[in-house]
């Protein structure tokens, strides 16, 4: 009995046969396809006399049709050349995966299940139809090699069928290209008349090209494709004009509306087989899978992803429903191709979904076709596949065999809840449970027969049902309620204020539930807040968040839990993308309501206040940097004016109410902005110097020394982390240190610069370079201070009357203090020293103490500034200077001619600025002394006014005629005269060099004037 024989299930393939078949497919493609040739629509018709019978079997369900109707050779060829090879490859991959499975017992069980079913000469439909095997099938289909192979089989199979059964190959009534004819009235409408081989008309096909507003579809890898043109074909449902069979094979179009090349073509084929009355009946549909629709309305066009490309099919969702209903009525079956969903009928839709942009509007969810009473119930093993439909991408699609929410809702909301609960009980996969809940929510909001109030009530009932459903695990309840909330968020038809009512009621149900733990309640609450924050207009967002806060306070939660929930609301607001002004307003409301309701602990209040402070600081920072940029890019202001203005901004920041840490962050942004500007490096360094001086000189009462150090470290960090080049950063670091010295900043402030470098996010070599720049600036500043002190002491003219001279004033203080003591001693008749002698002794002691104190302070200052010991003490520097002077004098002595000596003086004493001014002057003095001693030996009787030598005797001279009793505490330097002859040129050169060096700029910076 051929009706009970399945030649496909009986067909076994050895490895060698499979390889041979694959090779034949490749050869077939290379011989029969030409990439440059465009694929054509085709059709094949036969009369009753040509119809050949084969068993009518569902390659997807494995069941013979109840009435034992037969199918023609075309259908058989599709199954044999496409479906079965795809199945074989899929099973082969599943067996490979089972061999690698760690659970050996399960692997062996499944392997035996497959082998035993094969032995019964079946097409493994039981294995494919078992939901427990879905994970093995899905895993196999994740292999890119398998997907590519299945697509290759499909393309080769269609080419094979179309060529084998083509009219060109001599097959009676075989496939031939459709000859479309344009309608005279419209260029986008075409038609063709299909006749059987006897010349009788079977039907008229109408094709419409739709040029639509572009909409976007998402591919599996997440990339998006725009569709602006596709076509629709009005496939016939009932045919009663003439006898025969008909197969309509329509090529899928590319995203741009053009036909692909033949080597990439896939087809949507409708199989009309001769029925009992001789008329064609729609028995099967061959379509590449997963089949998807660009929307939920009946006019949504079908599309597929094949070989990484998007193709549109010439069938709408409404037409597909009609055709599938007719297939079922005619006891036929859909033939699904290409991927897992192509082969395993009744196990649900694929995981990919299209992304529909706002340009593509969608209507309400599709209601499944209503079948006549005599049609048996559709089961998972014989139900036609429901195609995918979605408005947004998601990770998992709901099982269409469980979901009929729109139909259930057409009765009553209770019917829908009963239906959903039955599905939740039956389905153990939590992902599918969640999808069922989401689909129910979508059906509620898309129900055109319901008004807003009814939709709100139904959504609230669904949320409550989800929370209280005992068949849902806690995590599934969270995900289910969140799915309802997400559906509310994505609904485009419900006004925002009406959404608010749904959100408030849902939050109340969640928080008052006794079936949820606090953690789960918080997760759902956070999702509700997210939905509120996603609303487009400011007013709706504010009202929604306030409403949710009110609900939290009014619930039956404990005081502690209410505080926790309010903090969760505040945290969501704080991390949102709202403007700072909106965040401040919303967080301020959370704090105010929480304090008034006495549900926030002091720690929680402090946390919210910290959020508010940070937002305030961010806003201040943003505003400040805008002002700084305006100043930097002002073409009418010079560097001095820019510096003054930025100093004023810096001062305002330091005087502000923010914490020292926040002030430091703002100052860091300022220096970083200056450093990254397009100004010249010298100009940027000058501005940075002004910032450093402003920080160093800021009032200690409003900004403590540790806080100054913290802010100064931040200032340097802003420089160090700027994107400008390293030499510029080094120069600006020096500028910052110079600013500190100009502002008389202490060593703690200078050391903070090193701290800022250490804490910056730069590499070690850059840190080392910046530290060297900082130390060099500190060294130079100390040298200037020391030199200024030395010059100040040297510059005091003892011969002139200076009533305000430091030493004179100190001497007067000593006299005033000593006189009463002397008078008391004289009265006691004890021997005393004269007043003059006492003054000399005291003054000498004071000078000595001043000298020691100066040396001690300088050395301590250097030690504090250089924790790593890389700044030398004054004694070390003096010893180093003496050594360098001796080296220069010795080197000078090696020059024999006057010209060489003059050149040495210019090169090493005048031009070499790397030597300190002090070393060069000491060298000149020593060389002059040597030159003059030599001349004095030659002519000891001749003296000159130009040479000063220390006299062998000391004598104190009166300060002035008005004060004859007070003598200056310094030895008088006598003058000798020597003869200047042979070395006059050298001595002249030395003295000229001395004058040049002494007139050099001491690099003193002019303090910035403040208004």
From Swiss-Prot:
It is found in: Cytoplasm. Residues 348-373, 380-396 have a biased composition (Polar residues). Keywords: Cytoplasm. One of its GO terms (cellular component) is cytoplasm. Residues 12-27 have a biased composition (Basic and acidic residues). It comes from the Bacteria. This is Antigenic heat-stable 120 kDa protein. It comes from Rickettsia sibirica subsp. mongolitimonae. The gene is sca4.
């Amino acid at each position: 009995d051929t009706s009970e024989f399945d030649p496909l299930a009986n067909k076994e393939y050895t490895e060698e046969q499979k390889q041979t078949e694959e090779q034949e497919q490749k050869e077939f493609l290379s011989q029969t396809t030409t990439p440059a040739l465009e694929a054509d629509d085709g059709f094949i018709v036969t009369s009753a006399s040509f119809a050949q019978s084969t068993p009518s079997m569902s390659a997807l369900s494995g069941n013979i049709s109840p009435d034992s109707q037969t199918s023609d050779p075309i259908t058989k060829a599709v199954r044999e050349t496409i479906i079965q090879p795809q199945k074989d490859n899929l099973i082969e991959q599943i067996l490979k995966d089972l061999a690698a499975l760690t659970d050996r017992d399960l692997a062996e069980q499944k392997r035996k299940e497959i082998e035993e079913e094969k032995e019964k000469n079946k097409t493994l439909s039981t294995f494919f139809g078992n939901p427990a095997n879905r994970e093995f099938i899905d895993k196999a289909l994740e292999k890119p090699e398998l997907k590519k192979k299945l697509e290759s089989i499909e393309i080769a199979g269609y080419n094979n069928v179309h060529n084998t059964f083509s009219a060109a190959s001599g097959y009676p009534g075989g496939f031939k290209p459709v000859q479309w004819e344009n309608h005279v009235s419209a260029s986008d409408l075409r038609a063709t008349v299909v006749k059987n081989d006897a010349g009788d008309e079977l039907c008229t096909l109408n094709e419409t090209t739709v040029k639509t507003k572009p909409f976007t579809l998402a591919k599996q890898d997440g990339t998006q494709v725009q569709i602006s043109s596709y076509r629709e074909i009005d496939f016939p449902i009932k045919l009663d004009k003439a006898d025969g069979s008909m197969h309509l094979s329509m090529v899928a179009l590319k995203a741009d509306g053009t036909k692909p090349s033949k080597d990439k073509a896939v087809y949507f084929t409708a199989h009309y087989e001769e029925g009992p009355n001789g008329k064609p009946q729609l028995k099967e549909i061959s379509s590449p899978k997963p089949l998807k629709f660009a929307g939920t309305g009946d006019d949504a066009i079908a599309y597929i992803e094949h070989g990484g490309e998007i193709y549109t099919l010439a069938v709408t969702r409404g037409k597909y429903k009609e055709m599938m209903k007719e297939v079922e009525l005619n006891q036929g079956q859909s033939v699904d191709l290409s991927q897992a969903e192509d082969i395993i009928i009744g196990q649900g839709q694929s995981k990919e979904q299209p992304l529909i942009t706002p340009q593509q509007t969608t209507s309400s969810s599709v209601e499944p076709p209503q079948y006549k009473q005599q049609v048996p119930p559709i089961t998972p093993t014989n139900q036609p596949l429901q195609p995918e439909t979605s408005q947004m991408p998601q990770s998992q699609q709901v099982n269409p065999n469980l979901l009929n929410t729109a139909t259930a809702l057409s009765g009553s909301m209770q019917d829908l809840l009963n239906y959903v609960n039955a599905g939740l009980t039956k389905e153990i996969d939590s992902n599918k449970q969640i999808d069922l809940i989401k689909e129910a929510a979508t059906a509620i909001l898309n129900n055109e027969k319901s008004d807003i109030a009814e939709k709100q009530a139904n959504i609230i009932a669904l949320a409550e049902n989800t929370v209280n459903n005992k068949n849902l695990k806690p995590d599934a309840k969270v995900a289910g309620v969140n799915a309802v909330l997400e559906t509310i968020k994505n609904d485009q038809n419900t006004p925002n204020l009406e959404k608010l009512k749904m959100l408030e009621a849902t939050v109340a149900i969640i928080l008052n539930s006794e079936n949820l733990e606090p953690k789960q309640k918080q997760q759902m609450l956070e999702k509700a807040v997210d939905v509120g924050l996603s609303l487009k207009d400011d007013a709706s967002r504010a009202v929604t968040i306030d409403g949710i806060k009110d609900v939290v306070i009014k619930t039956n939660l404990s005081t502690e839990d209410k505080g926790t929930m309010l903090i969760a609301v505040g945290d969501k607001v704080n991390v949102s993308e709202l403007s700072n002004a909106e965040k401040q307003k919303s967080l301020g409301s959370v704090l105010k309501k929480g304090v008034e309701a006495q549900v926030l602990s002091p720690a929680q209040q402090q946390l919210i206040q910290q959020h508010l402070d940070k937002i305030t600081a961010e806003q201040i920072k943003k505003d400040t940097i805008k002002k700084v940029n305006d100043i930097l890019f002002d073409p009418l202001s010079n560097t001095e004016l820019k510096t003054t203005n930025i100093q004023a901004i810096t001062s305002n920041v330091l005087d502000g109410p923010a914490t020292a840490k926040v002030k430091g962050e703002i100052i860091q942004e300022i220096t970083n902005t200056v450093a990254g500007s397009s100004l010249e490096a010298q100009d940027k360094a000058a501005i940075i110097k002004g910032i450093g001086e402003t920080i160093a000189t800021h009032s200690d009462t409003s900004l403590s020394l540790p806080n100054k150090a913290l802010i100064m470290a931040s200032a340097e960090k802003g420089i160090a982390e700027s994107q400008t080049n390293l030499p510029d950063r080094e120069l600006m670091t020096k500028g910052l240190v110079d600013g500190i010295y100009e502002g008389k900043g202490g060593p703690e402030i200078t050391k903070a610069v090193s701290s800022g470098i250490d804490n910056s996010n730069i590499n070690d070599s850059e840190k080392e370079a910046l530290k060297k720049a900082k130390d060099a600036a500190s060294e130079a500043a100390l040298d200037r201070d020391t030199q200024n002190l030395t010059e100040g002491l040297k510059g005091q003219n003892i011969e002139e009357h200076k009533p305000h001279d430091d030493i004179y004033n100190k001497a007067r203080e000593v006299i005033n203090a000593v006189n009463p003591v002397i008078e008391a001693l004289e009265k006691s008749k004890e021997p005393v020293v004269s007043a003059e002698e006492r003054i000399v002794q005291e003054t000498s002691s004071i000078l000595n103490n001043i000298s020691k104190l100066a040396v001690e302070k300088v050395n301590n200052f250097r030690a504090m500034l250089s924790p790593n010991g890389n700044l030398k003490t004054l004694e070390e520097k003096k010893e180093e200077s003496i050594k360098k002077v001796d080296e220069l004098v010795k080197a000078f002595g090696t020059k024999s001619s006057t010209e060489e000596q003059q050149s040495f003086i210019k090169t090493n004493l005048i031009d070499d600025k790397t030597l300190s001014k002090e070393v060069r002057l000491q060298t000149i003095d020593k060389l002059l002394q040597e030159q003059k001693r030599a001349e004095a030996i030659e002519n000891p009787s001749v003296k000159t006014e130009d040479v000063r030598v220390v006299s062998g005797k000391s004598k104190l001279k009166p300060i002035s005629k008005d004060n004859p009793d007070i003598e200056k505490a310094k030895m008088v330097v006598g003058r000798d005269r020597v003869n200047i002859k042979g070395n006059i040129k050298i001595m002249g050169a030395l003295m000229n060099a001395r004058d040049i060096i002494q007139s050099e700029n001491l690099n003193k910076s002019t303090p910035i004037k403040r208004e």
